[in-house]
Design a protein with these regions (language model features):
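Secretory targeting and sorting signals
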Residues: 1-28
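Short, intrinsically disordered low-complexity segments
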Residues: 1-3, 91, 212, 412, ...
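Residues at the start of alpha-helices and the adjacent loop-to-helix junctions
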Residues: 4-7, 20, 195, 388, ...
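Hydrophobic transmembrane signal anchors and adjacent membrane-proximal interface regions, especially
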Residues: 6-8, 21, 204, 397-401, ...
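Small side chains
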Residues: 15, 256, 363-365
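Carbohydrate-active catalytic/glycan-binding domains of CAZyme proteins
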Residues: 29-357, 438-735
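Beta-rich interaction/scaffold domains
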Residues: 355-441
Length: 735
């Protein structure tokens, strides 16, 4: 790589901190007990992104959000930081290791390029592939020596895949291991059938290697081993490469083993099928210990699917790995490695790989509620702050790229009750002005992960009935209720309906509820297994009892789309209407009992681009029909509306009224409901969005959503003004 001039972030560091951060670290001790103040400040993730693009088989970097191992930012704008110019000119499966003295790093990788079969077909590259690994050296993870190609496999090997290394104190050498197919000596053209075995060799300098030996040969193909040491035992995780069959049910998943000797050929079995049930298949495992607690992470590559999926455990010997529920990895990471880094290394990496010479790479401030949101295209930084944070003398720390300067300096105290301007000047004199805004963040409205909120004013209080979110495949089973006197402070009333014990016809997929009241009874409409049920109670807090013992709206009938997302609107004359649907929108008048309807009166009212989440209100004689468009997993999920003369329409589409606001980290805004403060013309929209990222907070996506609130206003002509999604939410509402 081109040499770089080192620039550390503009941070005011005390002498003590400088001493701690500049002291050379030792090798990461996987068996170290939990410590309150780790010498490591975060993690570096080196990876490739696959053979689907021309530069996908080159090495990329991502950096964790501090010591949060599940939330990451891409460095260098997601572009490669190391590219290969020799051998097969492709780099896969990068692995980075710190020397035992902590003064050097080695990066090794597979010499292979499969983009448009550059190196050949998958069969060919295992018969006549590279016998070498790629090697780089560095003292700082930024400046690397020229790459070198080092032969490690024997002459009869057909490939050299996914090299990794581990320092062995007893040997005083690195043990380097990889997968190879070995062909018979009398088969020089490698035409016979064989399978991958795990090989190893030792080295002190990654230049000269011992003669390779077979390390793991269970009698069938295995690849992609990774190792971590805890106390006196080495734990090895390897992909079972066999084709799935009744005799090998754990094929294409990970096997865990352990040994007190790293180079032993007889590891003890710990567990197999690791990853099964949470992913379709897995390879490329990388294992590492948490910097701050007794916990280990195992990232497994769901190749052909989502890419890396994180798992975690607090007991390596148990063999039990639990899928991490909240994470945000880089875009499309494939087989790579995670390395703990010190604060000095962390800062250096941030500065070395900005998106542009005038970028602000990151920012932090005391009393932040979530991670800073840096929007390169808008030259804007948003600091989500705690609701009671004092903004008058805030002194945020800002990182800029190497060779750049910042004015005013990072750490300068300023009054952030209004957004502040900073100027970044690159080494060539180019300048860019950035806006930094600190926002008191009252969002989310409800604690934890909640989606599809249905809000109503009942018995002198505001009530919200949401989907309990955060489950893979939206597989939750319980509904809760929350109430408030002011739309800001909410009481959790606990579980009001549990599908398992309370519903006989469904056990899971508890989604998108709705509430309605009639004659002192409360009717709770809910989704379960893509059908709509109804339960009844004497209080909005429940407990609710299934009213029918069967679905009110069943799947499998003549109606198109999914039978989900109920919503009830009651007109001034007392007639209640049930709206529902995914893909197609429907409405039907409910009978007086609120638990039945005349199926012949069902109407299809599907507007253009309708997805789901119907909701209807009435204001000044006009009916407003609202719904969500796109997919709840998309950051572009949004709300549109139409107006009409009756609850049944006809409807005239008016446009979008709620959509993402990415410069504030607000994405996936949708599946809303609306409430009016009685006796006023004040309206509020309650909706979900992707969860905000922050220390100990989930990363947002279509299964990790938070419920929030903003004002909804009308123009003089009765149209709805676009709702501006905010982090602030609303102030307490008093009647």
């Amino acid at each position: 790589m081109r040499p770089r001039t080192l620039l550390l972030p503009f941070l005011a560091l005390t002498g003590l901190l400088l001493t701690l951060l500049t002291a050379p670290p030792g090798a990461a001790d996987s068996g170290a007990p939990p410590v309150k103040h780790s010498k490591y400040a975060g993690y570096l993730f080196a990876y490739f992104t696959g053979e689907g693009t021309a530069d996908g088989e080159q090495i990329r970097y991502a950096l964790s959000r501090g010591n949060d191992a599940l939330h990451w930012r891409e460095l260098n704008a997601g572009k490669p930081v190391l590219t290969s110019t020799i051998g097969e000119k492709g780099l896969r499966d990068p692995f980075v290791i710190r020397s035992p003295k902590g003064d050097k790093f080695f990066l090794i990788a597979t010499d292979l390029r499969m983009y448009q079969n550059s190196s050949g077909s998958w069969d060919q590259v295992q018969r006549h592939g590279s016998k070498s690994i790629m090697v780089w050296e560095s003292t700082d993870l930024v400046h690397w020596t020229d790459q070198r190609l080092v032969k490690v496999s024997p002459d009869n090997a057909g490939n050299t895949w996914a090299p990794e290394a581990y320092w062995d104190d007893e040997l005083g050498e690195y043990v380097v291991f990889w997968a190879s197919k070995l062909y018979a000596d009398d088969d020089p053209d490698h035409k016979g059938n064989t399978y991958n075995k795990m090989m190893y060799a030792t080295t002190k300098d990654f230049r000269t290697f011992s003669k390779p030996k077979i390390w793991n040969d269970p009698g069938y193909s295995v690849i992609d081993s990774t190792v971590v040491k805890y106390k006196d035992e080495y734990y090895r995780y390897t992909k079972d490469e066999r084709d799935p069959s009744s005799s090998s049910p754990c094929s294409k998943f990970i096997t865990g083993e352990k040994s007190t000797s790293l180079t032993s050929t007889k590891y003890d079995f710990v567990a197999d099928c690791i990853g099964k049930g949470a992913m379709d298949r897995g390879e490329g495992p990388t294992v590492f210990k948490s910097n701050t607690e007794k916990k280990w992470y195992l990232f497994i590559d769901e190749y052909g699917g989502r890419g890396y999926v994180p798992f975690e455990t607090t007991d390596l010997a148990s063999g039990k790995w639990t899928p991490s529920t909240d994470y945000q990895l880089p875009a499309s990471p494939r087989h790579g490695t995670v390395l703990p880094v010190t604060q000095q290394e962390y800062d250096r990496l941030l500065a070395a790989y900005p998106s542009s010479p005038t970028s602000v790479v990151d920012a932090t401030a005391k009393h932040q509620k979530g991670y800073s949101i840096v929007t390169e295209s808008a030259s804007k930084v948003v600091l989500p702050m705690e609701p009671d944070a004092d903004l008058r003398g805030l002194a945020p720390k800002l990182w800029v790229g190497e060779g750049a300067t910042l004015s005013p300096k990072s750490g300068t105290r300023r009054d952030f009750r209004t957004p502040q301007k900073y100027t970044v000047t690159a080494a060539d004199g180019t300048k860019r002005t950035w806006t930094v805004e600190a926002v008191r963040t009252r969002s989310p409205l409800l604690p934890g992960l909640n989606a599809d909120p249905d809000v109503h004013y009942l018995n002198g209080r505001y009530w919200i009935y949401p989907t309990t979110d955060g489950f893979q495949g939206w597989s939750g089973t319980k509904f809760k209720a929350y109430s408030s006197k002011d739309l800001v402070h909410w009481k959790d009333h606990g579980v009001i309906l549990d599908l398992g014990p309370d519903v006989t016809w469904a056990d899971k997929y508890a989604w998108a509820p709705a509430i309605a009241e009639r004659n002192g009874k409360y009717y709770f409409y809910f989704c379960a297994e893509q059908q709509i049920g109804v339960a009844v109670a004497d209080s909005p807090a429940g407990p609710f009892k299934d009213a029918l013992g069967k679905p009110l709206v069943a799947k499998g009938g003549a109606l198109k789309g999914q039978m989900i997302d109920p919503s009830v609107f009651t007109d001034d004359d007392g007639q209640a209407y049930l709206y529902w649907g995914n893909g197609h929108g429907y409405v039907v008048p409910l009978n007086d009992d609120m638990v039945s309807f005349d199926a012949s009166k069902v109407q299809d009212i599907t507007p253009d681009n309708f997805r789901e989440g119907s909701f209807v209100i009435k204001r000044k004689g006009t009916y407003y029909f609202m719904w969500s468009e796109d997919d709840t997993r998309s950051e572009n999920y949004h709300v549109a509306y139409a107006t009409g003369p009756s609850p049944l329409g006809p409807w005239t589409k008016r446009g979008t009224i709620l959509q993402k606001r990415p410069e504030y980290g607000i994405l996936g805004t949708g599946h809303h409901s609306v409430v009016n403060t009685p006796g006023t013309d004040d309206w509020y929209m309650v909706y979900h969005r992707f969860a905000l990222n922050g220390p100990g907070r989930p990363g947002g996506d279509g299964m990790h959503r938070e419920t929030t609130i903003d004002r909804m206003e009308f123009a003089a002509d009765g149209t709805i003004k676009p709702v501006v999604p905010t982090l602030e939410g609303v102030k307490p509402v008093r009647r």
